[in-house]
A protein has these predicted regions:
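N-terminal maturation segment of proteins
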Residues: 1-299
Length: 299
């Protein structure tokens, strides 16, 4: 499935760009650069398609955003959300690794993944539902495909928000492409990157590919020898990490398509997102069963 998706994405990307993408300066001049302002913008743009946290709590969600200490940059992810203690759900933390997260659209979509409507928003929303409507013991269970699939799913949506930001500012970041197409291409680039890492992960840990084969594949996609070795080392020591993101994302999209068919004219992104969030972290088999139990009428 991941291989089929990669071929389809690559074909679409080549058709849109003519094989010569003009994306080099995309991080120069994006209208938003302050992380707090970016989170505020994301919260405003998501209102139409995502249920409000205010529907569940009168408390204000706080988020402390700081850069990763320079001494830890080499050992940290590009950014990460720190799950709050169970008795301090409103006190949230996001850390940004400036050595591997560029300003501009990359920072914007990264904060969407980690913050709104990604990890922070999903964690707080699902936790509030769990505390009041289901069983709190569910918090002890971990479903990486759901959590990271949701975060990557919302990251992909944030490219549409970024296009809106650019259009409102009448900017294209120096690219010859209009804002909407530019952000579509950047999203597809991201898909290709994550999908490639998934395929290489399977090649290494399931099919037993040699290091030289993986390095050759990475270099064929334009990575330097040093970058390729770094990616290989990560895949070798952290098997199946990227699969949580991309396969989870594919499953989330498949679930949305099922909801569109089942709910027909009563489908909306708001309803679908509420369904996923209220179901809470789960495996996709049970999410599908739960979806089949919902009525076609507006819920």
């Amino acid at each position: 499935k991941t291989y089929k998706e990669m071929k389809q994405t690559l074909t679409t990307y080549q058709e849109l760009t003519g094989g010569t993408p003009d994306l080099a300066p995309v991080n120069d001049g994006f209208p938003l650069s302050d992380p707090t302002a970016i989170l505020e913008d994301l919260q405003n743009r998501m209102q139409q398609d995502f249920p409000a946290l205010a529907d569940l709590t009168a408390q204000t969600v706080q988020c402390d955003i700081q850069d990763v200490d320079a001494g830890l940059e080499a050992y940290s992810s590009p950014a990460f959300y720190m799950i709050p203690p169970i008795d301090a759900l409103m006190q949230n933390t996001i850390r940004i690794n400036r050595s591997s997260t560029a300003d501009g659209i990359e920072l914007y979509t990264t904060l969407a993944h980690e913050g709104y409507p990604g990890h922070l928003y999903q964690t707080v929303y699902s936790s509030l539902v769990c505390d009041t409507q289901t069983l709190p013991i569910r918090k002890l269970f971990s479903y990486g495909g759901y959590v990271e699939g949701w975060a990557y799913y919302t990251e992909r949506i944030s490219y549409e928000y970024a296009a809106q930001v650019l259009a409102e500012a009448e900017g294209s970041l120096g690219s010859s492409y209009p804002a909407a197409l530019l952000c579509t291409l950047l999203a597809q680039q991201r898909d290709l990157q994550i999908n490639l890492f998934c395929l290489l992960d399977l090649s290494l840990h399931y099919y037993g590919a040699e290091e030289s084969e993986l390095l050759r594949s990475l270099e064929s996609f334009g990575l330097s020898e040093e970058q390729s070795e770094r990616v290989y080392d990560y895949l070798r020591t952290a098997p199946a990490v990227y699969l949580k993101y991309y396969v989870g994302y594919l499953e989330m999209n498949a679930l949305k398509k099922r909801a569109e068919l089942q709910w027909s004219d009563n489908f909306s992104l708001l309803r679908f997102h509420r369904f996923v969030l209220e179901a809470g972290p789960s495996d996709f088999e049970n999410l599908t069963k739960r979806l089949k139990q919902t009525a076609a009428k507006t819920g």
